[in-house]
Amino acid sequence: MMKLAGVVITFFPDIPELQKNINSYIDDLDFLVIWENTPIDKRNYKEDDLKNISQKVIVLGVGSNLGIGAALNQSIQHFLDYDCDYFITFDQDSSFDSGVLNQYKKLVTENSGEEIGVFGTNYISNDSLSYSDDSDSLIVNECITSGSIFPKTNFIKGLFFNEDFFIDAVDFEYCYRIAKTSGLTTVIFPKIILNHNIGYADQSFLSKLSDNYSAFRTFFLIKNQIYIWRKYPDLFEFKRKIHLVVKYITLRIVSVVFFEQDKYAKLKSIIRGINQGLSKP
């Protein structure tokens, strides 16, 4: 039977909601690391609130926000000596319906092969599925980190996440890189549904025009996506290139200038993101 260790990265979590989400999959995990990215001086809860969710939980962190890539890497490093075959990663707002993770594990076992580097799910966000295909499995260019299962052998080979990608596109960059450098494919199972919320965008009227992200988030979103476009132009799909140019840059500038607060910082972050995305080696 597959031995599966989990990692969930938390940042200012709602503890009851986090507990509910973890309880939706903890029975099908052998261990779970909760990596706490919330700065220790800004938490309104105790570490025991996390530990008490389950006896399988191990709480790790350094007291500050390391970003997604580094938090995933340090959590997985912790597990490399454990008796497990695969790792599954979660966002704090992700969950499975009853029995879904057990079914997912069976599919991974049945479809495992040396050529597969990532297994992913069909996630539901805002009442919409990301894939409408009813195939049993699909080979894709990329999948989101949350709900993805990674063979332990990836990390034994040194295929860790890019820590430069503090937030945004950590998942896409990983899938593209292991495909290019190691010939590993990404496979999703359209019938395995993950309940998930994409991003941290403002859900007001303004979001119809452009995602009202902070200056900090805006910088990494633009920088990282321009970088993976340059680095992996054949894998970063045309529709994503259009989305980046139109929504994340052009419409975002319009939105910031006419509707958003903190205009100077956000416009500066857009320019910095473009410059660093184009110049990063």
Please describe what each predicted stretch is.
Residues V8-D27:
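Short, well-formed alpha-helical segments that are part of the catalytic scaffolds
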Residues D30-D41, L60-V62:
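Short beta-strand/loop segment that forms part of the nucleotide-sugar
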Residues V62-F79:
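Glycine-rich, basic loop-to-helix element that forms the pyrophosphate-binding segment
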Residues C84-S95:
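Short beta-strand-to-loop acidic/aromatic patch adjacent to the donor-nucleotide binding site
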Residues S98-Y131:
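Conserved donor NDP-sugar-binding/catalytic core segment of glycosyltransferases
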Residues S132-F150, N212:
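A recurrent flexible, glycine/aromatic-enriched loop bordering the glycosyltransferase active site
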Residues N154, G158-L159, D164-I198:
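A short, conserved alpha-helix in the catalytic core of glycosyltransferases
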Residues P233-P281:
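Non-catalytic, C-terminal membrane-associated alpha-helical segments of glycosyltransferases
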